[in-house]
Curated annotation (Swiss-Prot):
Species, as recorded: Danio rerio (Zebrafish)
Physiological role: Probable mitochondrial transporter required for glutathione import into mitochondria. Glutathione, which plays key roles in oxidative metabolism, is produced exclusively in the cytosol and is imported in many organelles. Mitochondrial glutathione is required for the activity and stability of proteins containing iron-sulfur clusters.
BP term (GO), one: import into the mitochondrion
GO molecular function, a single term: glutathione transmembrane transporter activity
Source organism, top-level taxon: Eukaryota
PROSITE patterns in UniProt: SOLCAR
Gene3D superfamilies the record matches: Mitochondrial carrier domain
Compartments, record wording: Mitochondrion inner membrane
UniProt topology in membrane: Multi-pass membrane protein
Record-given protein name: Mitochondrial glutathione transporter SLC25A40
The reaction(s) this protein catalyses: glutathione(in) = glutathione(out)
Location, primary (coarse class): mitochondrion
Pfam family for this entry, one: Mito_carr
Length: 353
């Protein structure tokens, strides 16, 4: 088996359920390793510019970005905990010493409710589509990762988008599940099903190009590294390196879409909190024009290094743990098949005698 073909594996080599288990494990490990970096970043931001009530900020668990709405000053929330930090390392050490190591994962559990299922759907769909497209595309099979990545991202975003909308609305308006269901029914009655996918378009503008480029570069990079180091199967180091490089390239190219989407999400969340019309900033195009007018074209590339530092390790950890999980299940299946074959030989030999 060539290294480039090793990601999806041949039919029957690894089951979709095992792919789901591998991606679920990868998602949890990624969030546990990446979240502390974002928690420290948010604590440093809150120290420099305290978050007022209704202010929104972006929380990243390494899998998805989540818009969080600040609660009032009387509530003891993790991002308003007292502390004076001189830098990132100092913040890490003081948070662990003063608040306990668990504080580095503050706010993580609620975000995993959507992030883990979205990741499982995304990675499993990609592998299934990649295997199918490689067979169907023939001489153009090199482009299979491009199309498989784009389609898989559309699918996962479509499934998760209504849940993200509901989560943000519940947090910003402090509604119960019963009140929320009434709001949803009213929205469906007045605006139709489209109301549940508000913000879906801007999400796809960033995530679909990112996904297509990421998988295309990842498969190419993995194949090249395997060839370079004469590996028949990709090692953890190879998948980690290919994931980091492909994630970096995709994040740089799609940065303007990320800037626009994040600004739009934050503005929409704050307008919802203040009970103002969300139509003020509903257009992606208008947000982009406003950014250029206020900060020039360079404004669309704001946060270049923070995004790179966030995306590269997250992509590397996720893909390497996912590939490791698939390799584990592949080996398990082969051993099981070998044992079954050996048992059949023993039985047939016994019957002959």
């Amino acid at each position: 088996m060539s290294c480039q073909e090793s990601s999806p594996g041949p039919p029957g080599d690894i089951t979709p359920f095992q792919q789901m288990m591998a991606s679920c494990s990868g998602a949890i490990i990624t969030s546990l390793l990446v979240t502390p970096l974002d928690v420290v970043k948010i604590r440093l931001q809150a120290q420099k510019n305290p978050f007022p009530k209704g202010k929104c900020f972006v929380y990243c668990n390494g899998l998805m970005d989540h818009i969080c709405v600040c609660e009032n000053g009387n509530t003891k929330v993790w991002y308003k905990a007292p502390g004076h930090f001189s830098g990132t390392l100092d913040a890490f050490l003081k948070i662990i010493r003063m608040e306990g190591i668990r504080s580095l994962w503050s706010g993580l559990p609620p975000t995993l409710i959507m992030a883990v299922p979205a990741t499982v759907i995304y990675f499993t769909c990609y592998d299934q589509l990649f295997a199918l497209l490689k067979l169907k595309m023939g001489d153009r099979s090199d482009l299979a990762p491009l199309f498989a990545g784009a389609i898989a991202r559309v699918g996962s975003a479509t499934v998760i988008s209504p849940l993200e909308l509901i989560r943000t609305k519940m947090q910003s308006e402090k509604q119960s599940y019963r009140e929320m269901s009434a709001v949803i029914r009213s929205a469906l009655k007045n605006e139709g099903l489209r109301s549940l996918w508000r913000g879906w378009g801007p999400t796809l503008l960033r995530d679909v190009p990112f996904s297509a480029m990421y998988w295309f570069n990842y498969e190419k990079g993995k194949w090249w590294l395997c060839k370079r180091y004469s590996c028949s199967e990709p090692t953890v180091a190879i998948t980690f390196t290919a994931g980091a490089l492909s994630g970096s390239i995709a994040s740089i190219i799609t940065l303007p879409f990320d800037v626009v989407k994040t600004k739009r999400q934050v503005e929409m969340g704050e307008l919802q909190t203040m009970k103002l019309s969300t139509q003020v900033s509903s257009s992606t195009c208008s947000v982009m024009k406003r950014i250029v007018a206020e900060n020039g074209v360079s404004g669309l590339f704001a946060g270049f290094m923070p995004r790179l530092i966030k995306v590269a390790p997250a992509c590397a950890i996720m893909i390497s743990t996912y590939e490791f999980g698939k390799a584990f299940f592949r080996k398990y299946n082969h051993q099981k098949e070998g044992q079954a074959t050996a048992s059949q030989h023993i039985i047939s030999h016994t019957e002959k005698h």
